[in-house]
């Protein structure tokens, strides 16, 4: 059932991300080293950890579907923490909104006639879906709406599968690079440290792009590797993709730390659980929580160091 026939969109989410991405000054950022190939990134030592790429593939299998003449929703794998949707109309400006049980609304641009993957980041519960076509300016009309109530049994699914913002496949150069970087790792923390070190020393901040990027921008992780530069969203997408391909559940989060816009990555580590803000971008620099501390501290001490979450106010999770 349609909730509203006409809505007005503002680019609040992208403004939050892009405001963050355009912060900082060139003199605060060291020059990046030249990107290495995945083969060059490999070390002689072979670690104890299995570094075989683990790339989950979302499926629009057609078991459970909904739709109309312009929109198709595949809800066959809600239990895995994602849904798939495609727009088959002729309008060139189409928005998709997904509101979860926490009442946070995610707004996406629909960019393809193929099925695209969207994570159910708010967990199990009622989700409202709505697709809107542009009428004029910022005015959009509802062309499809639907309520779904997924029971997500694979709670790591939303943070292991690719999606619009974190897009990778087994053939991605970034996935091959992650496997090479992880070859010498003994545990997940070694992989996190290796990925962080590589990306922050081989990718430089693109100030020109930060000033000109438009609403609807989606990262291209292999493009970031090839160019050796990107904005904070490119950094985050690249690192999350690499870690997920190594079977490390990782969240890309955007929100506030205190009064400041921040982007941070949180990863799930055995014995410690979710480590919030293991990598963080403050508008100028990326920083990494000391992995030695995380590895050697008790769960209680680690949680005390990280805090109870009150310092972080997450707005969106991808």
Describe each region flagged by the PLM.
Residues 191-195, 228-243:
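Active-site nucleophilic cysteine motif
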Residues 234-318:
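Hydrophobic/aromatic-rich core segments of domains that either
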């Amino acid at each position: 059932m349609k909730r509203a026939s006409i809505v007005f969109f503002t680019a609040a989410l992208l403004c939050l991300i892009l405001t963050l991405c355009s912060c900082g000054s060139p003199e605060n950022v060291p020059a990046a080293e030249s990107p290495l190939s995945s083969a060059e990134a490999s070390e002689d030592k072979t670690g104890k950890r299995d570094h075989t790429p683990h790339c989950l593939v979302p499926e629009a299998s057609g078991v459970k579907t909904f739709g109309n003449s312009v929109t198709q929703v595949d809800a066959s794998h809600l239990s895995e923490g994602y849904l798939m949707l495609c727009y088959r109309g002729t309008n060139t400006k189409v928005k998709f909104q997904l509101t979860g049980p926490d009442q946070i609304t995610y707004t996406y641009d629909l960019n393809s006639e193929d099925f695209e993957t969207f994570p159910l980041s708010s967990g199990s519960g009622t989700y409202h879906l709505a697709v809107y076509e542009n009428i004029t300016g910022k005015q959009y009309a509802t062309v499809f709406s639907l309520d779904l109530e997924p029971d997500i049994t694979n709670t790591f699914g939303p943070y292991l599968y690719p999606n619009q913002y974190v897009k990778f496949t087994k053939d991605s150069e970034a996935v091959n690079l992650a496997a090479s970087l992880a070859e010498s790792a003994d545990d997940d923390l070694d992989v996190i440290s290796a990925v962080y070190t590589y990306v922050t020393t081989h990718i430089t901040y693109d100030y020109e792009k930060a000033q000109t990027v438009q609403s609807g921008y989606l990262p291209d992780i292999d493009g970031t590797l090839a160019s050796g530069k990107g904005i904070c969203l490119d950094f985050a997408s690249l690192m999350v993709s690499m870690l997920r391909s190594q079977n490390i559940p990782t969240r890309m989060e955007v929100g506030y730390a205190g009064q400041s816009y921040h982007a941070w990555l949180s990863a799930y580590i055995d014995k410690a659980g979710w480590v919030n803000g293991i990598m963080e971008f403050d508008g100028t620099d990326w920083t990494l929580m000391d992995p030695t501390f995380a590895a050697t501290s008790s769960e209680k001490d680690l949680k005390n160091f990280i805090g109870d979450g009150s310092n972080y106010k997450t707005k969106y999770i991808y």
